[in-house]
C-alpha cells in the first residue's frame, strides 16, 4: 500500500524497561536514581503514546516523500509502529514506569524491532517539535471527546426540558424568588451554558488545528 499510513490507534495498558538513556554517554558513571526520577516524564506522558506514534508515522511518510529515507525504511517504520501498537493493546508489551519518556520508549523499542531504519525516524525533527505535536494532538483528541460528551448531555437536558413544560417552579434573581417559570425553562438555562462551553471547545480545537506543527 505504499508509505502513506498516517494514523496508529492503540490503547495503553501498563508498562518496557529502557536501560539506556540517550544522553548516557556524557557521564563516566551511573546517574543517581533520584536524578533519573527527576528527569523522567513517563508517568504522565505515557498517555500520549498513541499521538506520539501517529505523529511519527506521518513524519516517516514525509521523509520518504522527500526522498530523505527510502520507501523500504518508511514501510519498516510503519510496520514496526503498528506492531508496537498491537502489542501494547493486547498487553504483550508494557511501558516501564522507569523509562525516561514516551518518545525514547517508542524510538528504542522500534529500533530494537526493525534495526537502523528506526534510528532514521528522528531525522529532521527535534525532540521539542515532537513534544509540541504530541501535546497538541492529545489535547485535540481530549477536546473532541469532551465535545461529544457535552453534546450528549445537552440532548438529555433538552429531552427532559420537553417533558417538563408544565411543571411550574419559582425563578430566582439575586437568590430571591421571582416570577414563576417551568422546570423545563430552568433546564434550558443549563443547556445554554453547556452550548457556550461547547463553542469554546470548538474554538480551541480550531486553534489547535491551525497551529499544529
Task: State the predicted function of each range.
Residues 18-213:
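A helix-coil-helix interface module used to build multimeric assemblies
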Residues 1-17:
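Short, Lys/Arg-enriched N-terminal segments with co-localized hydrophobic residues
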Amino acid at each position: 500500500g505504499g508509505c502513506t499510513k498516517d494514523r496508529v490507534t492503540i490503547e495503553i495498558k501498563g508498562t518496557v524497561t529502557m536501560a539506556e538513556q540517550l544522553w548516557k554517554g556524557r557521564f563516566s558513571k551511573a546517574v543517581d536514581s533520584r536524578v533519573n526520577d527527576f528527569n523522567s516524564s513517563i508517568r504522565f506522558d505515557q498517555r500520549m503514546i498513541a499521538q506520539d506514534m501517529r505523529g511519527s508515522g506521518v513524519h516517516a511518510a514525509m521523509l520518504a516523500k522527500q526522498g530523505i529515507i527510502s520507501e523500504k525504511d518508511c514501510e519498516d517504520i510503519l510496520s514496526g509502529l503498528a506492531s508496537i501498537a498491537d502489542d501494547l493493546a493486547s498487553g504483550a508489551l508494557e511501558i516501564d514506569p522507569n523509562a525516561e519518556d514516551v518518545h525514547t520508549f517508542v524510538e528504542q523499542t522500534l529500533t530494537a524491532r526493525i534495526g537502523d531504519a528506526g534510528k532514521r525516524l528522528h531525522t529532521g525533527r527535534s525532540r521539542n517539535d515532537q513534544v509540541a505535536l504530541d501535546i497538541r494532538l492529545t489535547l485535540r483528541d481530549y477536546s473532541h471527546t469532551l465535545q461529544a460528551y457535552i453534546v450528549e448531555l445537552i440532548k438529555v437536558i433538552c429531552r427532559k426540558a420537553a417533558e417538563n413544560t408544565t411543571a411550574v417552579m419559582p425563578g430566582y434573581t439575586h437568590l430571591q424568588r421571582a416570577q414563576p417559570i417551568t422546570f423545563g425553562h430552568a433546564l434550558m438555562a443549563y443547556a445554554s451554558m453547556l452550548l457556550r462551553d461547547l463553542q469554546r471547545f470548538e474554538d480551541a480545537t480550531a486553534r489547535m488545528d491551525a497551529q499544529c506543527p
